[in-house]
Amino acid sequence: MIASVRGEVLEVALDHAVIEAAGVGYRVNATPSTLSTLRTGTQARLITAMIVREDSMTLYGFTDAETRDLFLTLLSVSGVGPRLAMATLAVHDAGALRQALHDGDVAALTRVPGIGKRGAERMVLELRDKIGAAGAAGAPAGAARNGHAVRGPVVEALVGLGFAAKQAEEATDKVLAAEPEAGTSGALRAALSLLGKSR
């Protein structure tokens, strides 16, 4: 899986950028706020999520791992694909989105093109317990930092291996709840084992 891309920015368009890394130009889809930080001809690094489908492999880029993880979490919601997840993050930054989900703010969520009242309510229902409010207290600091660092790459790897985003999220959350200090490789092995038993 491609977890990040670093290199020269060759092109910045309305919905994507092209970044050259080791002689290869990667097209990375991104939100306007992320694209606004890039300048053609300069060096840049984006945290990425690679979504693999039967007929495509698409990179989505973010300025930080928290936003990337939130993107992957949005994909676990029924009816939310990569385009709608990116549209959501284009309208709301990570902190505002967490707060809206925590507060059940349907009005804020329906400001996203493509999300109606029912879709917003489903988002709140499915994600409120998964996503805490911005700055909310939760697990001990060390465990929280570790879970944050491990969760995104594990979920991304599982999605890349063909598991549904929701399955990947649930399996990873179970593993990290049982083993908060697990490393990325250990958590991935445990999640694969868990998913293998459920098949």
Swiss-Prot record:
Q: Where is this region: Flexible linker?
A: 143-153
What family is this protein classified in? Belongs to the RuvA family.
**Family matches, as CDD domains:** UBA_RuvA_C
Q: Please give the HAMAP family that the UniProt record associates with this protein.
A: DNA_HJ_migration_RuvA
A GO molecular function assigned to this protein is: four-way junction DNA binding
Q: What's a Pfam family this protein contains?
A: RuvA_C
Q: What does this protein do?
A: The RuvA-RuvB-RuvC complex processes Holliday junction (HJ) DNA during genetic recombination and DNA repair, while the RuvA-RuvB complex plays an important role in the rescue of blocked DNA replication forks via replication fork reversal (RFR). RuvA specifically binds to HJ cruciform DNA, conferring on it an open structure. The RuvB hexamer acts as an ATP-dependent pump, pulling dsDNA into and through the RuvAB complex. HJ branch migration allows RuvC to scan DNA until it finds its consensus sequence, where it cleaves and resolves the cruciform DNA.
Protein name in the entry: Holliday junction branch migration complex subunit RuvA
Which NCBIfam families does the UniProt record give?
ruvA (TIGR00084)
Whichever gene encodes this chain, its name is: ruvA
Subunit arrangement?
Homotetramer. Forms an RuvA(8)-RuvB(12)-Holliday junction (HJ) complex. HJ DNA is sandwiched between 2 RuvA tetramers; dsDNA enters through RuvA and exits via RuvB. An RuvB hexamer assembles on each DNA strand where it exits the tetramer. Each RuvB hexamer is contacted by two RuvA subunits (via domain III) on 2 adjacent RuvB subunits; this complex drives branch migration. In the full resolvosome a probable DNA-RuvA(4)-RuvB(12)-RuvC(2) complex forms which resolves the HJ.
Taxonomic classification: Bacteria, Bacillati, Actinomycetota, Actinomycetes, Mycobacteriales
Tell me which UniProt keywords the record has, alphabetically. Cytoplasm, DNA damage, DNA recombination, DNA repair, DNA-binding
